[in-house]
């Protein structure tokens, strides 16, 4: 192989392509120790800003665009593409080429129903038994399907944070899609009014924020050190980011108007777990303004949050 002839010369070969399970398996088996793998997720907001005439400037506009049109390169760079037609082709290719040929996923119809059901439960704690019951399939089948979606970067499972917090913590992950546009396509959301006023509005904005967080880590070559928290006595924190043994707490709210009420979960967490090393908390919202809400919690714009993530590493 050419790569073996001059091992001292690094970075001579760059291979790109969509997620091909078989190709990745062969590469890691034959080139172990000789390759670096970069995971390229759908475009982040920061990447979309480099596209001329992207049509979005504020956090509100980027959320609308990401939800209704998605973040895959083709639909972002070429706005004339019918995104619904593109998603239909994307799913057909993904199902028929990448999955049917490589995995025994069983009924394609059941798997498509599973995708739609999972999309309707984005930003929720993953309950495989409930999904299996609703679909009439075995729990192990759902586990297998989830693993496939995770391996192909369709979904991201956000683990719970329960280190040193005792046993009364929810320990199942929450499920997020790495492209919010795919969620909207799967559940049939096609216009702004239904997006912002429908029952999934808050979940979709949370999905948008978590997916942007995951992309920020991956785009810097880092594995996300991110979590959520839910206790059995009702305390919930949407996002915890850990760095150098310090926790940063975030609540995600689909609103442009913030109040002190939104600071209560973060302040309660600080009181309950005062021995932990906790940084200042933040509320991420559709507002483009940044200011202090309380001594321990600030309002942080999406733009400010993304800048903070860039500096974070």
Model-predicted segments: where are they?
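Active-site ExK catalytic segment of metal-dependent nucleases
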Residues: 242, 247-258
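Short, polar loop motifs at secondary-structure junctions
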Residues: 20-22, 283-290
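Arginine/glycine-rich "motif VI" loop of SF2 helicases in the C-terminal RecA-like domain
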Residues: 218-219, 268-278
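Mg2+/Mn2+-dependent nuclease catalytic core
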Residues: 255-272
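Interdomain motor-coupling "hinge/lid" segment immediately C-terminal to the ATP-binding subdomain
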Residues: 18-127
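Conserved catalytic/switch belt of AAA+ P-loop NTPases
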Residues: 1-15, 25-29
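Accessory nucleic acid-recognition modules appended to NTPase machines
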Residues: 80-247
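Domain-level recognition of nuclease-like catalytic cores that cleave nucleotide substrates
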Residues: 286-313
